[in-house]
Amino acid sequence: MTEQLVIHRHDYDAGNQGLSWARIIGIAFVIALHLTALMMLLIPAVAPKAPAEKERTTMVTLVDAPPPPPPPPPPPPPEDKPPPPVKNLSPPKPSPVPPPPEAPVVDVPEPRPSDIVTPPSPPAPPAPPSDIGASVDISSKNMNPPKYPPAAFRAGVQGEVILIVDVDANGNVTNVSVEKSSRNRDLDRAAMDAARKWKFNASTVNGQKAAGRVRVPVNFALN
């Protein structure tokens, strides 16, 4: 709705009249009417505020879970069955053993003197080695004593070995053999190893140096 404000202008000179109270009230009414109309147009443009929603509060109560049901009772043990009765069986009777047959009698003829075989006589002991006449130079530095075997020394083994040593014309050892053992292999071996390195004075035959043999005792003692 549109209102036109019409102000009548009067010529001052024509009427030379001032504003009356009625005119002032009319003008004020018209202005108020226009303001009211303007306010009516502005009010629908502002949307009313929606009322604030109230916060919803949910109450939660915690309840303990029910306990699990107890396990079922174990089944009753099976009843022990009595063992079956044992039958007593009579042992079988042994069958009779037939008697052994009688051995036949054999006549053994008596041996005659000519049928008796005499065992052969044992061989004669070997003769002692001959020509054991080479002299031994006791003071010679080339006759070093044998080394005591460590195993025999630790075990406290003692003994005597008698060696037969073959010597050539120059006094060198050509062969060593054991005439009497000490009953210990380590002692016998140590004596033979030492004798192979010895040096002797050769024997003399008709004023000439000749080969020969010498008997040397070697004693192993823990002194």
From Swiss-Prot:
One of its GO terms (cellular component) is plasma membrane protein complex. It is found in: Cell inner membrane. The chain crosses the membrane at residues 24-44. GO terms for molecular function: energy transducer activity. It is a single-pass membrane protein. Residues 45-223 are periplasmic. Residues 65-103, 119-129 have a biased composition (Pro residues). Residues 61-143 are annotated as: Disordered. Residues 133-223 form the TonB C-terminal domain. Coiled coil: none annotated. It comes from the Bacteria. GO terms for biological process: protein transport; transmembrane transport. Residues 1-23 are cytoplasmic. Keywords: Cell inner membrane, Cell membrane, Membrane, Protein transport, Repeat, Signal-anchor, Transmembrane, Transmembrane helix, Transport. It holds the Pfam family TonB_C. The keyword Membrane applies. The keyword Transmembrane helix applies. PANTHER family: PROTEIN TONB (PTHR33446:SF2), PROTEIN TONB-RELATED (PTHR33446). Interacts with outer membrane receptor proteins that carry out high-affinity binding and energy dependent uptake into the periplasmic space of specific substrates. It could act to transduce energy from the cytoplasmic membrane to specific energy-requiring processes in the outer membrane, resulting in the release into the periplasm of ligands bound by these outer membrane proteins. Belongs to the TonB family. NCBIfam families: tonB_Cterm (TIGR01352). Homodimer. Forms a complex with the accessory proteins ExbB and ExbD. This is Protein TonB. The lineage of its organism: Bacteria, Pseudomonadati, Pseudomonadota, Gammaproteobacteria, Lysobacterales.
